[in-house]
Each structure stands twice: as structure tokens, then as C-alpha cells.
Amino acid sequence: MLKAVHFGAGNIGRGFIGYLLYKSGYEITFVDISKELVESINNYKRYNVIILKDNVEKEEVKNIKAIHIEDEENLSKAIVDADIITTSVGANNLKSIGEKLRNYLKIRKANIDKPLNIMACENALFATNILKNSILEKGDKDFIEYVNQKIGFPNTAVDRIVPNVDIKKELPIDVAVEDFYEWDIEKKAIIGDLNIKGAELVDDLEPYIERKLFLLNGAHATTAYLGYLKGYKYIHEAIQDDFIRNIVSKMQEEASIALSKKHNIKIDNLREYSNKVIKRFKNSYLKDEVVRVGREPTRKLSGNDRLMMPAKLCYEIGITPKFILYGIAAGFLFDYKEDPQACKIQDDIKNFGLEKTISKITGLEENSDLLHEIVKKYKELKETFRKR
């Protein structure tokens, strides 16, 4: 049986990546920092994926085990034997995962000659490159040559909503997911054979990554931040609001025009994708909280993420990203007290002023037209929703 090692045994790891790897015939070793989660996986040796739709379905995932990330002996054995390594740990953690992998791959190099593919399945642009660079960073010439010859590092675009929904479970490690999923993999970077059921191998990944980042992640964040301002708890409630849905649909249209021009994609295909995204947001079975979707606003409002990237692309090609900027402005009004990044943004606005805070997070110059437009939208939304 083929063997997979997956870093990150959370909801995405179990409900999406692990689910498809199991369906593709892999035995899966999850690696995680949580001792409790590792013990649970090893105790139950299986879990259920609950697919949330009108007729709820349940699929069992078996042939699994787990290793704590500090269990060097067993993790070393797993890496040596692996046919594929994947991650869903958050892009901010890839550097540290790469540093650990470097040491284990040196052991693998001394013990086995078979090819390996390593993929970071994260909500970030070209996340596998981040992981690869971390692995190679302190490697000697011999190690770098081995990695380049024997290990493939395909970038990926992954998409499945896995909310923290309160639902009856057979096992504590069961996970609930939406019916939709998409996993696009960079074909040219694969070494050897890679067959993952339900994944699509593509020649040029960038259009897929940006389509998902702008039209799904950007729209999701906009729905969350505006929904928070209007007092909604769930995404499916927020997207039913005419004011919010109008802004979200129009920001998708702005981003679609920019994507169409950049990548020569048919605009009708992007509009169809956008409509499917809105339909997914309306899924009331997900009970996806706006504060979950809006969390970590410093990252989501940064210059190379889901809102600023399409805004800058629009501006570059002569489109005023009016509705994308509403999402960005709403993000700076997201003051959820249990989110450390949201609290820090509000403190910075109070201590250093709005313009300096926006500039610091987005990377825009304080005197730039885009920043001034964000300030205008911020003041408009603040006045409308009386945020103090």
C-alpha cells in the first residue's frame, strides 16, 4: 500500500487532504503538535467525514495513524517510507516544517532511492515553494542535488470549506465538510507518478491559485467582515443580506475582469465560478461563523493576499476596485475581541492613526490613491454602522 505523511491533523487535514489520500489508496500517517489529537487518531484508527448537504452523507476513512511532531524516531521512519508528503499547517508554519523535514530527508537519502513528492496544501500563493526553500536553505551541495533529482515539489490550489460546525458525531475526531472540493496540482513539478483521486493536474497553476484566492477567499473575507459589521453570526445569513451580497458579487466581477485580462480566461467562466461560490456560501448546513472566516485580519489584509492582490491588479489595468475596497475597509473595522490580530489592528489605529495602520498592513504608501480610497470606504462604513 502507498504511504502518505500529512503534517497537520486538523479539520482540513482530515476532512479534505486525508480524505482524498485515503480514497486514492494511501495509508496515512498524520503528524501533529497536539498530543490529544495524536492519541485519539491512534486510539480510534478511523474517522468519518460528514458531508453537509440536503441528504447528509458519511464516509469512513481508515488505514490511519498519527505521530507527534516531536517523536523523532517514528517520524524519521515515516518520512523514509513515504511515497508522498503533504501539509495543511498554515503558511506561517511552513518554514519550521521545512527545517524539520530537511533532517529527515537526509536520513531518507542515506536509506532509500525512490522518488517522492512533497506538497503544501495551504491558503497561500505557491506555498510549496516556501516549504522547498526552507528545506534547501541550509543543505550542502550533495543534499541539494539529491532533492532536485529525487523530490518533486508541485504547488497546489486547494479548496474545501471545513467549518467548526456543531453536529452529532460518532467519534470525537469525525469532521464535517461541504460537498464541494477542488485540488489542483502543478503537473510539471511532479516526479514519477502521482495519482490522487479527485485532484486535477494542470499545466499552469497560477490562474487556478489566483481565481480561488480572489473569487473564493476574497469574497469569503468580504462576506465575513461585512457580516460582522451588520451583526450576523453565520456566513449563510450574511450572504442572504442584499447589501452584502451586492458588494460581494460586484467585487467578484471586478476581480474577474482583472483575472480575465491577466490570464486570458473567458469572463463567462469566471462568472460561473463566482456564482458557484455564492451558492456555496448560502449552504446553511455549514453554520460557518463570520468570526472564523474573518480571523487573522493582518494576514488577510496584507499586500499579497486575497483582497489587496486583486485590488492592486485592478488598479494596474485601469479598473477602480470600488467594491473590493469595501471588503478591505470592513476588515479594518473587524474588532472581534477574541482575535489577537484584530485587537492589534484596532490598537494601532488608535495609537498611530488609520492611514499609518493601513499602510503598515497593506504595504501601500500613505499618499497612494488606493490607500485614500480605503480610508474613504472605512469612514463610510463606520458612519453607516456606527462603529466607534
From Swiss-Prot:
GO CC, one annotated term: cytosol
TM ranges: none
Entry keyword set: NAD, Oxidoreductase
PROSITE patterns per record: MANNITOL_DHGENASE
Coiled-coil segments: none
Molecular function via GO: mannitol-1-phosphate 5-dehydrogenase activity
Residues engaged in binding NAD(+): 4-15
One Pfam family named in its UniProt record: Mannitol_dh
Catalyzed reactions per annotation: D-mannitol 1-phosphate + NAD(+) = beta-D-fructose 6-phosphate + NADH + H(+)
EC number(s) stated in the UniProt entry for this protein: 1.1.1.17
GO-annotated biological processes: mannitol catabolic process
Matches recorded under PANTHER family: ALTRONATE OXIDOREDUCTASE-RELATED (PTHR30524:SF0), MANNITOL-1-PHOSPHATE 5-DEHYDROGENASE (PTHR30524)
Family of this protein: Belongs to the mannitol dehydrogenase family.
Protein name as annotated: Mannitol-1-phosphate 5-dehydrogenase
